[in-house]
């Protein structure tokens, strides 16, 4: 999966079911998981993270979920066709035997630890590797340490066969220049593949993730509508749209992601997250969103995908001003 220096392709990981479950108090049903995972898989997202938001094997004190880890794993596995499935484990909060369950259903496991305590999670790393799981080390609360401390942890992880190490902006503290410094430090210390997981407390999650990619990160995390702990995560619709504008991720169906975000996530949490996917689509295509409500109504009345109508309108419309009549002509043409 590592790309050449001449053309690096980002690898997008969606954690709507895992980190996004904070936004619904860990109450996703197994039907929710099937629908969300199925939509993401169909859209071409290559890595999908599931399981309890805090950690697989979470005790009741971490917040009871609507279903067990195994029920979530089975639900996701029943619908996924192409994506790799994984979960997060926090060794300080979970029993090592939980790794065995992950090995029965999943493809990868992300092990959370602060940068100065990597040796404490070595038993979990070895157990996961013995189960054939792709292991990623998540250096949580990265902002607490200087970049060279993360670099040393990343080098140690690579020495024991770990291929992926993440910078994790747990508290949403980073600015883009911080994301760059930390990613570059990890990249410079070993040939480990670097990931970036951003939170949106300063409304910088998308900008930080793009900067992390430019600095050399390969794995980029996001969630539908930016659902997640606290202020939320990097909104995957924005992230994919921005990367596609740069010529990346041609195999990902952006319209399908827009539709999944609205159908699967809107209204699900009492807290407001993210930007309306249709507004993102208007921005992506360079259309003035003044007529978004007319377009929505016309598309829905015709039984068409709003995202598809936006895309077709952008292809057909060449003028400076988009009128309701312009939209109506597009809809009629799509129905013909």
Swiss-Prot record:
Catalytic activity annotation: oxaloacetate + H(+) = pyruvate + CO2
Keyword Zinc: no
Listed GO biological process terms: L-leucine biosynthetic process
SUPFAM superfamilies: Aldolase (SSF51569)
Record's keyword annotation contains Manganese: yes
Cofactor note: Activity is metal ion dependent and can be restored upon addition of excess Mn(2+).
Cofactor(s), by name: a divalent metal cation
GO terms assigned for molecular function: 2-isopropylmalate synthase activity; metal ion binding; oxaloacetate decarboxylase activity
Binding site for Mn(2+): 19, 197, 199
EC number of this enzyme: 4.1.1.112
Keywords: Lyase, Manganese, Metal-binding
InterPro entries: 2-IPM_HCS-like (IPR050073), Aldolase_TIM (IPR013785), PYR_CT (IPR000891)
Domain Pyruvate carboxyltransferase residues, every copy: 10-258
Regulation: Activity is abolished upon incubation with Chelex and EDTA.
Pfam family, one: HMGL-like
Site positions (Transition state stabilizer): 18
Role: Exhibits oxaloacetate decarboxylase activity. Lacks any detectable aldolase activity with 4-hydroxy-2-oxopentanoate (HOPA), 4-hydroxy-2-oxohexanoate (HOHA) or other 4-hydroxy-2-oxoacids.
Record family assignment: Belongs to the 4-hydroxy-2-oxovalerate aldolase family.
Assembly and interaction partners: Homodimer.
Protein name: Oxaloacetate decarboxylase
Species whose genome carries this gene: Mycobacterium tuberculosis (strain ATCC 25618 / H37Rv)
């Amino acid at each position: 999966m590592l790309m050449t220096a001449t053309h690096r392709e980002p690898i997008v990981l969606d954690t709507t079911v895992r980190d996004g479950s904070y936004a619904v108090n860990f109450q996703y049903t197994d039907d929710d998981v099937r629908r969300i995972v199925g939509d993401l898989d169909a859209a071409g997202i290559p890595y999908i993270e599931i399981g309890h938001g805090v950690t697989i094997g979470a005790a009741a004190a971490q917040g009871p979920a609507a279903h067990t880890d195994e029920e979530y794993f089975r639900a996701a596995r029943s619908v996924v066709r192409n994506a790799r499935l994984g979960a997060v484990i926090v060794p300080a909060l979970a029993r090592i035997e939980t790794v065995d369950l992950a090995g029965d259903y999943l493809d990868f496991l992300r092990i959370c630890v602060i940068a100065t305590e990597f040796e404490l999670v070595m038993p979990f790393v070895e157990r996961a590797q013995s189960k054939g799981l792709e292991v990623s080390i998540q250096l949580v609360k990265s902002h607490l340490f200087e970049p060279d401390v993360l670099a040393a942890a990343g080098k140690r992880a690579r020495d024991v066969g770990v291929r992926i190490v993440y910078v994790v902006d747990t508290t949403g503290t980073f600015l883009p220049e911080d994301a760059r410094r930390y990613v570059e430090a990890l990249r410079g210390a070993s040939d480990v593949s670097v990931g970036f997981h951003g939170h949106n407390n300063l409304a910088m999650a998308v900008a930080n993730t793009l900067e992390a990619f430019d600095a050399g990160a390969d794995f980029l995390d996001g969630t539908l509508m930016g659902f997640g702990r606290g202020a939320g995560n990097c909104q995957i619709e924005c992230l994919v749209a921005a990367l596609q504008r740069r010529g990346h991720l041609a195999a990902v169906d952006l319209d399908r992601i827009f539709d999944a975000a609205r159908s699967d996530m809107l209204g699900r949490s009492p807290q407001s997250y993210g930007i309306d996917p249709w507004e993102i689509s208007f921005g992506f295509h360079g259309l003035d969103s003044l007529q978004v409500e007319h377009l929505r109504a016309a598309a829905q009345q015709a039984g068409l995908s709003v995202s598809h109508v936006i895309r077709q309108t952008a292809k057909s419309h060449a003028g400076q001003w988009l009128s309701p009549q312009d939209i109506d002509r597009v809809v009629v043409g799509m129905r013909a």
